[in-house]
């Protein structure tokens, strides 16, 4: 499963109301690069979840919409609503536990 590059123009059509894990990051963010392979691995294991990446420098309105103020921020959405928020780099197990609680 691939990770969708999200923007204002495609966010609602790709994510919609499906369960989703959205990774907010930036090219300059070291910890964002650290969690990227973890998110990619989880995406391959969970095809039932929509995975997305938002570069906050390119999509500041989406960052504002979800009140993202620090990086990396990972949001877990269900029915279009944030059900879990992770600030900073987390372990694979942390993300998996949250997905399994959906």
Regions found by a protein language model. Give the residues of each.
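Conserved helix-turn-beta segment immediately C-terminal to the redox Cys motif
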Residues: 17-19, 34-54
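Structural signal for short hydrophobic segments within the conserved structured cores
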Residues: 4, 50-52, 81-86
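Structural micro-motif
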Residues: 60, 66-75
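Short active-site neighborhood of thiol/selenol oxidoreductases, capturing the structured segment around
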Residues: 15-27
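Short acidic active-site motifs
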Residues: 9-10, 58-62, 94
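N-terminal "domain-start" segment that seeds a small globular fold
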Residues: 1-13, 50
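Conserved redox-active cysteine motifs that mediate thiol-disulfide chemistry
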Residues: 24-38
């Amino acid at each position: 499963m691939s990770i969708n590059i999200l923007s204002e123009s495609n966010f609602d059509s790709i994510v919609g109301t499906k369960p989703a894990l959205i990774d907010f990051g930036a090219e300059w963010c070291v910890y964002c690069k650290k969690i990227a392979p973890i998110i990619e691995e989880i995406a391959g294991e969970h095809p039932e979840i929509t995975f997305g990446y938002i570069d906050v420098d390119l999509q500041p309105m989406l960052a504002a919409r979800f009140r993202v103020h620090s990086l990396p921020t990972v949001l877990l959405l269900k029915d279009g609503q944030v059900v879990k928020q992770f600030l900073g780099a987390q372990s694979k197990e942390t993300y998996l536990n949250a997905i399994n609680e959906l």
